[in-house]
Amino acid sequence: MQLPRFQEEDGETLFVIEYDDAATAGLGTLNDLRVIADRVDARRIRLEITESAAMRDPEYTVDVLSSVRSLGYTVILDDFGTGYSSMAWLHRLPAQILKIDRTFVRDLATDADSRRIVEVMVSLARDLGLATTAEGIETDEQSRILAEIGCDYGQGFLLGRPVPASELVAGLRTTS
């Protein structure tokens, strides 16, 4: 496991564990997450599940994600706006961050409807006490508009590309 090693290298890096199936994030995974929480500060780890995966079995998802939160992990609802969740489920899911799908970010600078949809998503999240992350940021203009709208976090090639763990460790060493 490389997470404790990353924690030694850099005390600020956040890690994301992605699940595209609520069943995958079930009881076996909860046991794994308990072990990880004993070795790494769980507040530095985000567990991300897609909206469509969460809606396959919403009651089960609520139970699993509530357990995950009780371990100290932050829960992210990914690809928001692309699945089939109702506002009732959005209210019940124990997520702390709403991740706005790249399909809404892509045309943000050129399409008034895309911008308005993102504004409403950010406003809704804020009203529910959730932070927001926009994914798929590829231009300075998208980044500027999202900051103007009040989106809390961003993700995309403009901000950084995914790297293998070995490169991340090497990069942490050279910047410390």
Q: What is each stretch, according to the model?
A:
Residues L3-F6, L14, E18-L27, R44-D57, ...:
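EAL-family c-di-GMP phosphodiesterase catalytic domain
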Residues T61-V64, S86:
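Short beta-alpha junctions and helix-cap segments that line functional grooves
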Residues M1-F6, D32-I36, S67, D127:
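Amphipathic alpha-helical regulatory segments at dimerization interfaces
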Residues N31-R39, D63-L71, V120:
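Catalytic-core regions built around general acid/base machinery
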